[in-house]
Regions:
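Extreme N-terminal starter segment of soluble prokaryotic enzymes
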Residues: 1-2
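Residue-level recognition of beta-strand termini and adjacent short loop/turns
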Residues: 8-10, 25
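Flexible, glycine-rich phosphate/dinucleotide-binding loops
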Residues: 10-12, 52, 92, 104
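Short N-terminal binding/cap micro-motifs at the start of the first secondary-structure element
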Residues: 11-15, 40-41
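Glycine-rich beta-strand-centered segment in the early N-terminal region that forms part
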Residues: 21-36, 49-99
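Iron-sulfur (Fe-S) cluster-binding segments and ferredoxin-like electron-carrier domains
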Residues: 43, 47, 99-105
Length: 105
């Protein structure tokens, strides 16, 4: 799949790349993004103003889309569900992404 990726720290440093489609783990879902917003966080990331961003990274944490695949322990949504996300304010704090401070994943 194609993604606009922040490849390294610093201003711009973005590339349109072909990346592997993720496979959801037991407690994760894969969302096909239909709409996304560009907010201040993304602009600061684009400009290289956040030193905590771990690259490579696909920017964008405000989005909506359709659940394309679910992990085996997911019970609250089904494949085909329409979902939205804003991960900055409410994260589980337990999954691998949260432990790695990759809250947007």
């Amino acid at each position: 799949m194609k993604a606009l990726v922040k490849t390294e720290p610093g201003y711009n440093k973005m590339e349109l790349l072909e990346i592997e489609k993720p496979v959801p783990k037991d407690r994760e879902v894969l969302v096909k993004v239909i709409y996304t917003g560009i907010c201040g966080t993304d602009i600061h990331g684009f400009k290289g103003e956040y030193d905590r961003l771990k690259t490579p990274l696909v920017l964008g944490h405000e989005f909506s889309g359709v659940v394309e695949a679910i992990g085996k322990n997911v019970t609250k949504v089904q494949k085909g569900s329409f979902v939205t996300s804003e991960t900055t304010f409410d994260t589980c704090g337990e999954c691998e992404s949260c432990q790695n401070k990759e809250y947007n994943l």
